[in-house]
Structures are given as structure tokens and as C-alpha cells.
Amino acid sequence: MLLRYFRLIRINNWIKNVIIFSPLFFAGKISNIVLLQQSLISFISFSFLTSSIYILNDYMDLEHDRAHPSKKNRPLASGKVPIAHAGGMAIVLLIVGLGIISQLSIDTFYVSLSYVVIMVAYCLVFRKMALVDIGIIATGFVIRLYVGSTVTGIPNSMWIIIMTFLLALFIT
């Protein structure tokens, strides 16, 4: 039973949030325990935020997913997780994620909040607009980079910003 909730929040997609550690790694400060701890907390908290967005996206795609050969097995589309449970879980993940991040750094909070706003707009409006949707998804990866930068105080170089965006465009 618990497995369906783990599938709902897409823990397997949390790997995308490893980008948060990039500023720490590229600055050669990965062994700094305090910065590593802050990055780890922001990674977990940001993962809560991304999970809340995945739930919203699954809700928005519900009818389409039910008719899709493989997506029909997703927890919401299959009915294995009630919509009310998923909605409640999304709200809790969002509040907890933003709450923890707000305790780390106000800048990290605002960067994370911008991610939430952009991704909610994506789910509600932009996901059906070709090229715009890809640009927004790629921007989400750059925002992850800024989460790592703001929580550690390590500035991102222009090359890592550009390369992250281009790589995200490529894999999207």
C-alpha cells in the first residue's frame, strides 16, 4: 500500500535534484560538512516541492493517463490512490518543503517559490505549448542549480548555468 504513495510522489525522479549539489562540487567545497548538510536539507525539501508538482501534473493529466497503455497504471489514473489523498499529500509536501527551505535561506526560499510558481503555470497552461514546455522544464533545472547556489552562498559560473540549460533542453 505504501508503495503506491512512493510511486505517486515519484521518488525515482528525485535524482534530478542532485543538481542542487553542483555549486558545492564545482567550487571544491563538497567536503565542507556545514555546506553539505545545508545542501542535503535543501535537496530533500526541494524534492518535496517537486513531488507536489508531479502530483498536480498527474491530476491535470488524469483523463489522458487513464486512456494511455502504460500511464493508466499510475497511482492516480488507476485509482489506487484517491484524488483527495493525492491532493492532501501535495499540499503537505508543498508546505513542509517551503517551510524547511525558508529556515535555510530567504534567497533559497524565493528561488524555490519561483520554481513552484513556474511549474504550476506549466501544469495549468504551458504544458500544451510546444517549445515553451521544453523551455520551462529546462528552466526548472537551472532553478535547481540556483537553489544549491543560494543555500551555500557559492555563486554559479555562467558556463554551468548555460551548460545546465542546454543539457536539460537536450534530454527533454
Stretch-by-stretch model annotation:
Residues 130-140:
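Cytoplasmic-side transmembrane-helix entry/capping segments in multi-pass membrane proteins
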Residues 25-44, 98-110, 145-163:
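Helix-coil boundary and interhelical linker segments in multi-pass alpha-helical membrane proteins
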Residues 2-6, 11-13, 124, 142, ...:
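C-terminal membrane-associated helical module and adjoining short loops/tails
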Residues 60-64, 108, 125, 130, ...:
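Membrane-interfacial segments
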Residues 1-66, 80-88, 92:
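Topogenic membrane-insertion module of multi-pass membrane proteins
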Residues 18-22, 40, 44-51, 88-99, ...:
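Generic alpha-helical transmembrane segments of integral inner-membrane proteins
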Residues 62, 67-112, 158-169:
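Multi-pass membrane catalytic core of lipid/isoprenoid biosynthesis enzymes
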Residues 47-59, 117-125, 146, 164-172:
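Transmembrane alpha-helical segments that form the membrane-embedded catalytic/substrate-channel core
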